[in-house]
A protein has these predicted regions:
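Position-driven detector of the extreme protein N-terminus
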Residues: 2, 10, 143-145
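Catalytic phosphate/metal-binding cores of nucleic-acid and nucleotide-processing enzymes, i.e., regions
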Residues: 2-8, 24-26
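Hydrophobic membrane-insertion alpha-helices, especially the h-region
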Residues: 7-18
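Bacterial extracytoplasmic/cell-wall-associated proteins, especially those involved in peptidoglycan
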Residues: 17-152
Length: 152
């Protein structure tokens, strides 16, 4: 599971309040904080340094999977599912070192999680970095919904 430290929670909460959300307490109930946290960490590792649209796309794929009965029913379960997101399963550190970038990643995840953006991936449940592998074996028979920067 993607763990939330107290420092990280403080960063997340300050961002929610500083962005002036009309109802930030609605996000702080139940599994919402964990879901938003998992999505933000996923964006950090999957699309750090990419455009806001590409970061939104990564978050949208996660929520599209949550909405699809073939996948787990929460963002954290989708992200940590066996071999789905490479950063979670590789042997490298998952530490977040760039808090400025991470704040932007949280914002991208928040836009998707609170349904404040269009589905830029048009319902897609998969993507891959086409500069690394084009296409991966599991994607050979799939229809391309969109290409955004380094992701298809």
């Amino acid at each position: 599971m993607v763990e939330i430290s107290w420092n990280a929670m403080a960063v997340l909460l300050s961002i929610l309040f500083n962005w002036g959300l009309q109802n930030p307490d609605a996000i702080l109930y139940g599994d919402n904080v964990s879901s938003l946290w998992c999505m933000s960490v996923n964006v950090y590792h999957e699309a750090r340094g990419e455009t806001r649209t590409e970061q939104i796309a990564v978050s949208q794929v996660v929520l599209n999977r949550v909405a699809d009965p073939r996948w787990p029913d929460t963002p954290c379960k989708v992200i940590t599912q066996n071999q789905q997101f490479s950063w979670y399963w590789d042997t490298r550190s998952d530490q977040i070192h760039d808090l400025r970038t991470f704040r932007e990643n949280i914002y991208a995840a928040l836009l998707v999680y609170t349904d404040r953006t269009d589905d830029v991936v048009k319902g897609a449940t998969h993507y891959y970095a086409h500069d690394i592998i084009d296409p991966p074996p599991w994607g050979k028979n799939m229809t391309v919904a969109n290409k955004l920067g380094g992701h298809t």
